[in-house]
Amino acid sequence: MGDRNNDGDQKMEDVLLPGFRFHPTDEELVSFYLKRKVQHNPLSIELIRQLDIYKYDPWDLPKFAMTGEKEWYFYCPRDRKYRNSSRPNRVTGAGFWKATGTDRPIYSSEGNKCIGLKKSLVFYKGRAAKGVKTDWMMHEFRLPSLSEPSPPSKRFFDSPVSPNDSWAICRIFKKTNTTTLRALSHSFVSSLPPETSTDTMSNQKQSNTYHFSSDKILKPSSHFQFHHENMNTPKTSNSTTPSVPTISPFSYLDFTSYDKPTNVFNPVSCLDQQYLTNLFLATQETQPQFPRLPSSNEIPSFLLNTSSDSTFLGEFTSHIDLSAVLAQEQCPPLVSLPQEYQETGFEGNGIMKNMRGSNEDHLGDHCDTLRFDDFTSTINENHRHHQDLKQNMTLLESYYSSLSSINSDLPACFSSTT
């Protein structure tokens, strides 16, 4: 019978030991291993050795352990420092173990029942007053005390230690030194080639930079749209009507990604006569080119020569581009011209603007000169001011038609005498 038990133990050792790693959880240490030790129910295989660890320094304990590579486990009796005290004696030959906090409860995974207690301790070299902290750590596991209190005489003299407090499982390990890790990491970084360090820095800078991408722009919103044209659109010379460049809405508020732009239109760099002409918003109708108007110094003779011919004025007003005046009114808020355009201006024809009132005061106060360049393409018309401008042109025509009757009342600046 005994031979069969020995054969069974030998087979169990052959099965468990090869490749075996002992990494129990806190619950397994308390509920299985420590509980069996307190109940005097040992295992057939000695995985945790019984040893009074306080008789040795922590750096000497790994050689006594049965298992473990970085953690070593021991059954340790809880001897009391004093006869009538529950405080254990944790003094060794080279130092002492000091608790870092209170006991932490260990709960069962099946419920909220406390099945054990865990305490953390640190080893100090030297005596209590001048001890030097080391990297050696210990976790002490023990069972909770019995709920039934015993009489004082029996507790302190006859049986000072309860069965649950008689044994503890101690896990010994050495904490990784943070200073050592910092030194190792510094030496590793310094040993890297310069190219690697440079690439790392460039990648960090690149990751912190916002990029804009034109191909990831959403559809334009209904507000804050910027209109631009494609200046590279070819133009056909055979067509009678000038081709209107394609105007596409573009919103700077609808970016979904911040990538670097690849093709971004810059209106300032491409600012020229054709670009300024096509910036004006308008309808699609084509306006004929109006004849050249006399300059400001030719107005007196022009008025005298045409005072008796009202048909010319009618033909003239029918060819006046009403949107030209509108374009002048809309030009300042639409575009800001470069410095060279502001200094030189646009050379072109002059027309009389907003002729209202009567007699010489009206004629002298409201004569203004508009200067435009040669408009070869269409100038679009703003629908909101269209009716007002047509009324102004009607007043202008009626005023010139009545010049024959008021020729004698003209001011001296419009007389034919020099």
From Swiss-Prot:
UniProt keyword annotation of Transcription present: yes
DNA-binding residues (ranges): 115-181
Keyword Nucleus carried by entry: yes
Location of the protein in the cell: Nucleus
Disrupted gene: phenotype observed: Fewer root cap layers; reduced number of columella (COL) and lateral root cap (LRC) cell layers from late embryogenesis due to impaired periclinal divisions in epidermal (Epi)/LRC and COL stem cells.
One annotated GO biological process: somatic stem cell division
GO cellular component term, pick one: nucleus
Tissues/organs with expression: Expressed in root cap stem cells and their immediate daughters.
Gene3D superfamilies: NAC domain
Any one GO MF annotation of this record: DNA binding
Transmembrane segments: none
InterPro entries documented for this protein: NAC-dom, NAC_dom_sf
PROSITE patterns: NAC
Domain NAC: 16-175
Induction of its expression: Repressed by SMB in oriented-divised root cap stem cells.
Keywords: DNA-binding, Nucleus, Transcription, Transcription regulation
Pfam families the UniProt entry points to: NAM
Domain notes per entry: The NAC domain includes a DNA-binding domain and a dimerization domain.
Role description: Promotes periclinal root capforming cell divisions. Activates expression of its negative regulator SMB in a feedback loop for controlled switches in cell division plane.
Protein name, per record: Protein FEZ
